[in-house]
Curated annotation (Swiss-Prot):
InterPro entries: NagB/RpiA_transferase-like, Ribose5P_isomerase_typA_subgr, Ribose5P_isomerase_type_A. Pathway: Carbohydrate degradation; pentose phosphate pathway; D-ribose 5-phosphate from D-ribulose 5-phosphate (non-oxidative stage): step 1/1. PANTHER family: RIBOSE-5-PHOSPHATE ISOMERASE. The keyword Isomerase applies. Keywords: Isomerase. It catalyses: aldehydo-D-ribose 5-phosphate = D-ribulose 5-phosphate. This is Ribose-5-phosphate isomerase A. GO terms for molecular function: ribose-5-phosphate isomerase activity. It comes from the Bacteria. Catalyzes the reversible conversion of ribose-5-phosphate to ribulose 5-phosphate. The gene is rpiA.
Amino acid sequence: MSGNADALKKAAAEAAMQYIEDGTVVGVGTGSTVNFFIDALAERKHDIEGAVSSSEASTERLKSHGIEVFELNSVVEVPIYVDGADEITEHGQMVKGGGGALTREKIIAAVARKFVCVADESKMVGRLGQFPVPVEVIPMARSYVAREIVKLGGDPVWRQGFTTDNGNWILDVHNFDIMEPMKLEAELNNIVGVVTNGLFAQRGADIALIAREDGVQTLKVSG
């Protein structure tokens, strides 16, 4: 089963290569599907200027392939950002951050002109919320943020033993009834001590490449 899942992830990741423009800096996300994208990108490393990366793990993989990794502050434009999702709807709204890289992912997504999500069909959902919503918090605010999240109807669980690349902690929030993703995303971000959360609703995917048994489906959300 895992071999088949990997084949679907690889198919979705390789389909994203059609959107890569020569001579540009490519935004690169984090996760198992993105790892396949990085491997495919290596075959065109001489065509691109380099990449900006959303995690130390992706940076390490990019560099191992000889792809130059730039600091985001030194880059003027990121034409495309390729990343996976833990859940995605037909509207391109997502839950992301199961791997803990949500803040840097959200920053690069905000900068990028186009967001291409690569995923297998198991990630497509009618409504977000089955997968816990990760919330990155400043460590000293963990208990306070957790209490505020309970008031919003969520059940926060501290991801003990995990520290983000930014030196912060993660609360995985279960049992959210997500009827209005953009509203909940804003409410979570308004809690003092929250860095950001894994709802990508205000800035979702422009294109979703969903790998199924019979091929890769292209879902154009906007643009």
